[in-house]
């Protein structure tokens, strides 16, 4: 499984991760997202 964490800014995590072509995303607080590719 690939994982990358980003500062997503105003985008929601799911939108941000989907646009980055990951399978799904999870917020980890303070506007940061971890995106996962299953």
Curated annotation (Swiss-Prot):
The processes (GO biological process) annotated in the record are: defense response to fungus; killing of cells of another organism
> Is Methyltransferase a UniProt keyword of this protein?
no
Q: Which residues form a coiled coil?
A: none
Q: Does the keyword Thylakoid apply?
A: no
- S-S bridge residues: 5-27, 13-33, 17-34
| Annotated keywords | Antimicrobial, Disulfide bond, Fungicide, Plant defense
Q: Per the similarity annotation, which family is this?
A: Belongs to the DEFL family.
The entry's protein name is: Putative defensin-like protein 105
Q: Which organism is it from?
A: Arabidopsis thaliana
